[in-house]
Amino acid sequence: MKELAKQYDPSQVEDRIYQAWLDGGYFHTKADPDKKPYTIVMPPPNVTGQLHMGHAVDNTMQDILIRTKRMQGYAALWVPGTDHASIATEAKVVEAMRAEGLTKEMVGRDGFLDRAWAWKTKFGNRIVSQLKKLGSSCDWDRERFTMDEGCSEAVKEVFVRLYDQGLIYRGNRMVNWCPHCNTSISDAEVEYEEKDGNFWHLLYPVKETGEMLELATTRPETMLGDTAVAINGEDPRYAHLHGCHVVLPLLNKEIPIVCDEHADMTKGTGVVKITPAHDPNDFEVGLRHDLPIVRVFTYDGHMTGAADKAAADALFAAGKNTVNEPQVLDCGKYAGMTTLEARKAILADLKEGGFLKEIEPLKHEVGTCYRCHSTIEPMVSKQWFVKMEPLAKPAIESVEKGEIKFVPERFTKNYMNWMKNTRDWCISRQLWWGHQIPAWYCDDCGETVVAKSAPCTCPKCGGTKLTQDPDTLDTWFSSALWPFSTLGWPNEDSADLKYFYPTNTLVTGYDIIGFWVSRMIFSGLAYTGKAPFDTVCIHGIVRDSQGRKMSKSLGNGIDPLEVIAKYGADALRFMLVDGSTPGNDMRYSETKVEAARNFANKLWNATRFVLMNLPEDFEPGLPSEDKLDMSDKWVLTKLNQVAGAMTDNLDHYEMGLAAAKINSFIWDVYCDWFIEIAKPRLNSGDAQQADTARRVLVYVLDKALKLLHPFMPFITEELYQALPGSAETIMTQAWPTFDAAHNWAAEEEAFEKVMDYIKAVRTMRTEMNVHPAKKTSMIIETADAAPFQNAQVYLAKFAFATDVTFTEKYEGSTDGMVQVSTHAARGFIPMMELIDREKELARLNKEKAKAEKELAMFGNQLNNPKFVERAPAALVEDIRNKFAKSQDKLANIEQSIQALG
């Protein structure tokens, strides 16, 4: 048998254990026709990222599920991998180049990509090694990257299929533009922040009547791109202006007044300015009225100038403009200013010209980039889009039919809201790091060719000069294919794809249901004909101890690796799930980490005690039932119940409840009670009693370690290996299940009567400050004496009884006796010689006053007809029970006071 160190030191165990798992190949999974598959694909963290608490909770939950299923006999596959993270990675590389005095353009696309791949190689393994420190039992032989050869093949296959089906198109549409990242982003990537702003009330003169039309805007810098003013055709205030024009202030340009339902008669003056190039609603108005689209912002957030206009004019002159191609304005004196600089200058000029009537402060939601938090500029830009309506419909139906369920169920609504309100997905990004769009343009005739590999000639004109689209695909485009691209798709003959797909459970945060979950669902259905998983298990975010979101600005982030270095990975893992509820945010608590570490130490010490009491020739195995005493059957029944309950909890993704159950069983049942109960038997001199106690101790410990293993894998492996008869690894051992043969309900109930009585006696002695060495006789009044008679050795050891008398009804003198009561027994214990009478009377009188106060409070509630009639029946019953218990408590206190004279 292996000898354990006196103290548990995770730093001496965890790395060694993990390497042994890797060397043993225990994480690797292959198709096995004799086993049922269970598959999880890891939400791929950014390749340049570092482990944070979100990763820690996400991967701990996945590891718990995988380890459990592996022990339950499944071919449990957990596919790991990382995401290329276009925007984030490109920003990191650009920042590093800037420090060298370089830009992307200076080194060119190929040179930049060489640097990006070098960056990925240098930093890409960092988060993988950190996930290993956490204990993640992924199949690292199958590690994937969203830009590896297989994923790239899948991306090109999907793009070409969708294009051929008419579901991918390129056009000038309104997009969300980030001037800092210098790329478009999708609707789902826009975060909204409440900010202070203003409504600037402007005056536009009507050419035909000379009157002033008042309108309000939060973005006066866009007015240079106004191509109309809208009124509602039903608004009687402006009926006389139908067909008229306004003169655009500052530019002195005539633009039409159009009648459109977008102008709300009930809001403000009912007049709105229309800037089709820089507002999504205005863009739609522009399409309805065939208005010019005039862009006044550059893509890096400045006002357009002469050079910008010349480039656009040349495009139009060459006939290369496409539908909804924006014209570009030379903004003159404002050209080159940032949008905020232009706002100040334009407002000053409007005020000077008498066109600024009023400034109205307001709070409003401003769209920001989810990556850099810069303000998003709506822009009409030529981009690639996916038509969402045909793809969203089956994805909605799949969830409605129950093919995919969300846990907790309430997140189904989040998913449905997103899917039912989704717009066409802008998938092109003006970045170099990522999957370059597989589309080429003929330099001779302008034909667009979409193909999985570079075409040699133009199919339209035969030209040989073709240029690939410089844009890359949205990162989420490749991530959407993750559940099946990692298993061999588009090779539908892939053995892994046939066996492990569809996957089973997706574990992820609620913040990316729109970004990622929804896209995986419609992608799986569209390209494989199957839902990619059957369950989406949602977890919340980890907040700090004050309930605040962890952020760099607050400086309240917690580094999981620092926690692991201090307390061990097991303690961090257990803290993250113990008592947690699916879908709810959780608070990081160092106190809870310390408690988890203490739990590990408690288990370590308990195992050392058991091992020290085993003879060298000990062979594990439960003795026959006739050799088991009441306490053995009690602990085996408790173990049985915990195994059944935990299995049910984990089947329903209630990891917090499962963790709490095994914690309570090991700490309260096994360590605090059963080990203590076993000690007298181990030292009794009765060989059979000692052997039975040892066998039950080892059997229960073995099962408890297996139940705890998914939560605390390192310490359970180390302790399991120390047990006699252990196998190569705990992680491939059978998961304990409910066993009807080990369910002794009568013995459990009987022994708990004894336990309750012992607890009551010990509590009383503690309150009276009676030293354990001071023992006394006792009389036990009970209608069922058998459990107590069978447990006299425990009464002597733990209730400090010298001798015990049993009676159904005690009618003797109670002078000098203290009474303790439980639901099954009442004890009469002579304590006068063991206590300080005056101190005890003072304590009892204090307890009496407290009990009288409780009794009065519950009585007042029950005497209130309105409470009894209107409160929930369960609450009223609960108050009645508390009232009855308070009555019994007060009666016992009064009897004890009387006994003390």
Residue ranges and their predicted role:
Residues 54-66, 73, 82-83, 151-154, ...:
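Structured ligand/cofactor/substrate-binding pocket environments in proteins
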Residues 181, 251, 372, 443-445, ...:
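Short Cys/His-rich metal-coordination motifs, predominantly Zn2+-binding knuckles/fingers
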Residues 6, 81-84, 112-117, 141-152, ...:
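Conserved short loop/turn motifs at secondary-structure junctions
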Residues 67-75, 96-109, 129, 133-138, ...:
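Secondary-structure transition/capping motifs at alpha-helix termini
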Residues 34-42, 64, 100-103, 128-135, ...:
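Active-site-adjacent bridging/hinge elements
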Residues 201, 417-477, 481, 526-569, ...:
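Feature 926 captures the class I aminoacyl-tRNA synthetase adenylation module centered on the KMSKS loop
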Residues 1-234, 275-288, 292-311, 343, ...:
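N-terminal, positively charged nucleic-acid-binding surface of large information/translation enzymes
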Residues 1-4, 43-51, 109-113, 138-145, ...:
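Glycine- and acidic
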